[in-house]
Amino acid sequence: MIGRLRGIILEKQPPLVLLETNGVGYEVQLPMTCFYELPDIGQEAIIFTQFVVREDAQLLYGFNDKQERALFRELIKVNGVGPKLALAILSGMSAQQFVAAVEREDITTLVKLPGVGKKTAERLVVEMKDRFKGLNGDLFNNTGDIQLPASNSSQISDADIEAEAASALVALGYKPQEASRLVSKIAKPGADCETLIRDALRAAL
């Protein structure tokens, strides 16, 4: 199992990053809350990973620390929650916010996440509450919130950036029409892709 990668970032295409380690390029999917914190292309990054094997693919999911990965591992144990939905959940809100929503039994907030209906939200509350007891550390202090660094603007048109942001939302589980609506709702001139994705995810909640 691949549990940790250290290498140079070659490409960033939300929610995917290409990381070169010892001459090998690894494609890693990250929750957007983790993606925002990645360094720029060409810089070194350390990513904690979860290797997932499916019938048609072998996938790597990445996280900024072991606790975020531990939460992902617990999420995919919940009935009806696979890696794709777990990635969408942790993209839609920070780990702290998710823990807080579960502990408050806030079904209304949870159902706003892509792919989460009422029954899934109820299962998350029932099954995850007990699991939190084994997850320790500052990440699971539900009074906190993630701080998102500013990103550098690229030299492409606003329309292209908005299309890229909408594509990232589709990859996270939103329907194309809903993704476009969310991006259009929060779009502003000069905004970079990561800002649009972040603001769209916040608007969805």
From Swiss-Prot:
Region (Flexible linker): 144-156
InterPro entries on file: DNA_helicase_Holl-junc_RuvA_I (IPR013849), Hlx-hairpin-Hlx_DNA-bd_motif (IPR003583), NA-bd_OB-fold (IPR012340), RuvA (IPR000085), RuvA_2-like (IPR010994), RuvA_C (IPR011114), RuvA_C_sf (IPR036267)
Pfam families (UniProt xref): HHH_5, RuvA_C, RuvA_N
Record's GO cellular component terms: cytoplasm; Holliday junction helicase complex; Holliday junction resolvase complex
UniProt keywords, alphabetically: Cytoplasm, DNA damage, DNA recombination, DNA repair, DNA-binding
Main localization (coarse): cytoplasm
MF term (GO), any: ATP binding
Domain of life: Bacteria
SS bond partners: none
Localization, UniProt: Cytoplasm
Region Domain I, annotated ranges: 1-64
HAMAP family: DNA_HJ_migration_RuvA
Task of the protein: The RuvA-RuvB-RuvC complex processes Holliday junction (HJ) DNA during genetic recombination and DNA repair, while the RuvA-RuvB complex plays an important role in the rescue of blocked DNA replication forks via replication fork reversal (RFR). RuvA specifically binds to HJ cruciform DNA, conferring on it an open structure. The RuvB hexamer acts as an ATP-dependent pump, pulling dsDNA into and through the RuvAB complex. HJ branch migration allows RuvC to scan DNA until it finds its consensus sequence, where it cleaves and resolves the cruciform DNA.
Family membership noted in the UniProt record: Belongs to the RuvA family.
Protein name: Holliday junction branch migration complex subunit RuvA
Record organism: Yersinia enterocolitica serotype O:8 / biotype 1B (strain NCTC 13174 / 8081)
Lineage: Bacteria, Pseudomonadati, Pseudomonadota, Gammaproteobacteria, Enterobacterales
